Every structure is written in structure tokens, then in C-alpha cells.
Design a protein with these regions (language model features):
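Internal alpha-helical scaffold of NAD(P)-dependent oxidoreductase catalytic cores
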Residues: 1-22, 29-70, 74
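NAD(P)-dependent Rossmann-like dehydrogenase/reductase catalytic/cofactor-binding core
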Residues: 51-137
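Alpha-helical structural signal
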Residues: 18, 22-25, 29, 87, ...
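Active-site/ligand-binding neighborhood in enzyme catalytic cores
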Residues: 25-36, 80, 102-105
Length: 137
């Protein structure tokens, strides 16, 4: 009744995981490396880290029977390119010495991985790196 367009989706879980994949691949890496989003896809090592983190999360989706709308790595890279000059919210949190949402992003991947018996070493490392930064505030 507010006159706003609305879309009802039976695919809420898919939409949440699609969004999570982008955050998994971009946020912690930009915060640790202290770089804008585009840097991640402009340099080989950071691009590989993005891929590894997202592929770990993708394995969890597959194990849970969640069919994503996009190839998550390509989608994440596309978002990084489209927002190349932007600094992620996690980067901004770290820059301002605020507690981040790491536990709800990469930490969620780690927790789901543990429940499902799926190793998530890259995401676990990213969580520990961000927590180490936060502990220094």
C-alpha cells in the first residue's frame, strides 16, 4: 500500500547466499590488505585469495542443496570491478577501529563448514586476521 515495488521470493536462502558470496570474497580481504574493491581483481595473489574464499563457501552451498543464481566467483569479481573505487564496509570498520561483521560473513562460512565437515582454511584464516586486527584496537 506504500506504492513501493515489491517482489516476493521463495528463494530467500539463495538470495542471502548470493549476497554472502560477494561479502565473503571482498570484505575481509580489502580490510586486511587495506585496499579498494577493485584491487582484488587487478592483482593475481589477491584474486586467487578471493577465489579460494568464495569456492569454500560454494562447497557449503552445494552440500546444503542451495543452487546459486550465478557462478559465485565470477559474480564476486564482477561486483569488485563494478565497485572498483569503493572501500568495503569492513575496510571502513577496520580503518575506524570498529568491530566488524566478520563473524556473520566469513565466520558464518567457517561455522557451517564445521557443521558439515567441510574444511574452510582460507575463510578461517581471514576470520583470525580480522580478529587479530580488532584485538589491537
Amino acid at each position: 500500500e506504500a506504492g513501493l515495488p515489491m517482489r516476493v521470493s521463495d528463494e530467500v536462502t539463495v538470495l542471502v547466499w548470493d549476497k554472502l558470496m560477494v561479502n565473503v570474497g571482498i570484505n575481509a580481504l580489502t580490510a586486511v590488505l587495506k585496499v579498494p574493491n577493485g584491487y582484488l581483481v587487478e592483482h593475481t595473489s589477491s584474486e586467487k585469495l578471493l577465489e579460494y574464499a568464495v569456492r569454500e563457501a560454494e562447497k557449503i552451498c552445494k552440500a546444503k542443496g542451495i543452487q546459486l543464481k550465478h557462478d559465485p566467483v565470477q559474480h564476486c569479481k564482477d561486483v569488485a570491478r563494478a565497485t572498483a573505487a569503493n572501500y568495503s564496509s569492513m575496510y571502513q570498520d577496520v580503518a575506524k577501529k570498529r568491530i566488524t561483521e566478520i563473524d556473520y560473513i566469513n565466520g558464518a562460512v567457517v561455522n557451517e563448514g564445521k557443521k558439515l565437515g567441510i574444511p574452510t582454511p582460507v575463510n578461517e584464516t581471514l576470520v583470525l586476521l580480522i580478529r587479530a586486527i580488532e584485538e589491537g584496537y
